[in-house]
Amino acid sequence: MSADDRTRDPELDVLRGLALIGVCVMNYHGYLLQRGGNAGNGALAHVFDPWRGPLSTRFAAVFVAVAGMGVVLLTHRARSSGDRAQVSAVRWVLVRRGVLLFAFGFFLDWVWPGTILFFYGAFFLAASVLFTLRCRWLAIVGASAALGAAAIQWWAVDRAAHGHDTSWLLWGDAETTRSPGDLLFDVAVRGTHPLLPWLIFL
């Protein structure tokens, strides 16, 4: 048994596994409904509603929160040592993981729209920048992400109510348009799991 195996927390693996299963179940359920499946009208139909039900985003939120815990454990030694070389090495580990997940998730989204992998990669890239911050600053960043998302939605609703077009902000498809601007807005604001507000879970 290696040192990594001895120090690995099985609780995180269990949570990650349960969250992944939940994400797959909810995504596949939504896919079947879009293909004409019958959800029914009972209480379970409401609970497992992939868009408005109480479980609609819970598994994805747990998935991102567990990723944040994993980042804390991965970077703990480097942060505690204060060694810039160790910090840089861990930062590049996060960047590589983020780029891989971002690229794979981007192409997967062409086949299966709405997956979290695309945004999961963006979360790791954000974590590579943020992991050296103190807890209070991380809390400020997370709260700012949530408040920023709420402010954007409020502004868009207010503008639309006064007859202004807000589709450039809230609607778009980077996979179709191949636009860097659409890609940025998809990741930050209007995707299924954008950095605003989902960064609060990391």
Give short role names for the model-derived ranges.
Residues 1-76:
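N-terminal signal-anchor module of multipass membrane proteins
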Residues 16, 93-97, 101, 138:
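Residue-level signature of transmembrane alpha-helical entry/exit and packing/kink sites
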Residues 24-28, 102-109, 145-155:
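Aromatic-anchored segments of alpha-helical transmembrane domains
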Residues 61-76, 117-131, 188-202:
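Specific transmembrane alpha-helix
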Residues 71-88, 99-109:
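Short juxtamembrane and helix-loop transition motifs at transmembrane-helix boundaries
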